[in-house]
């Protein structure tokens, strides 16, 4: 390629630079760390309010164990099949057969085996009490829905639809006359997670090995005649 550029197109000397190596952003737990910004909330926790003051979100982030991150990276195809099956997206019969053939040949895990192995990796090991029974609380993987990061529903009411659930149970737009509920914001929060996982806070590089626990979503809406659907549009 460089020869063609020099001799046929540019007709001048070209100084090639060093190759660009992609990298990922992550968070780590170390023995010596700065004290948390808010001692009451603890490390990795934040309470954020929208500019309209109508929505407050409490969330916490923590590192995903290294072996779990590696497992997710190796099984991106299984995560993709999880979403495809959940959404019942079958573009063609041939693709469905090909996917099942890959599973039968051992090229990719079935959704059931993927969930089983992921649960074992999350819960086995020292200091992983916080991951117990979290497998059924996973809302999404990211970025691009197949990455090595988790969005986890840690709310008391379970406002999110779960990744391993058979179908979506929350997040639908409010019906006429229905009051706005935090679950109506679930898909918006999930989308925000995908954006944040795709562009990290330091260098806008994708995140890797980060779990986001959404602990509470609070609405503070003025009582008026505005419909819930209109309020959701403004939020």
Give the positions of each predicted feature.
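Accessory interaction regions appended to the cores of large information-processing enzymes
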Residues: 1-235
């Amino acid at each position: 390629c460089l020869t063609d550029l020099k001799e046929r197109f540019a007709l001048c000397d070209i100084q090639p630079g060093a190759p660009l190596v992609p990298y990922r952003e992550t968070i780590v737990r170390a023995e010596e760390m700065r004290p948390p910004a808010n001692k009451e909330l603890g490390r990795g926790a934040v309470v954020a309010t929208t500019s309209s003051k109508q929505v407050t979100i409490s969330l916490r982030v923590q590192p995903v164990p290294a072996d779990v991150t590696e497992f997710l990276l190796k099984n991106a195809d299984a995560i993709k099949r999880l979403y495809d099956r959940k959404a019942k997206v079958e573009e063609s019969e041939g693709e469905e057969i090909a996917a099942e053939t890959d599973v039968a040949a051992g090229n990719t895990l079935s959704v059931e085996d993927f969930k089983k192995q992921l649960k074992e990796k999350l819960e086995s090991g020292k200091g992983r009490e916080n991951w117990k029974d979290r497998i059924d609380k996973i809302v999404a993987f990211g970025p691009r829905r197949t990455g090595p990061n988790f969005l986890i529903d840690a709310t008391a009411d379970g406002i999110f639809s779960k990744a391993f659930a058979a179908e979506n149970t929350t997040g639908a737009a409010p019906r006429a006359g229905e009051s706005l509920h935090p679950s109506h914001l679930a898909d918006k929060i999930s989308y925000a997670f995908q954006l944040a996982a795709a562009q990290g806070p330091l260098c806008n590089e994708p995140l890797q090995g980060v779990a986001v626990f959404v602990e509470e979503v609070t609405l503070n809406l003025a009582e008026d005649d505005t419909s819930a659907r209109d309020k959701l549009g403004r939020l």
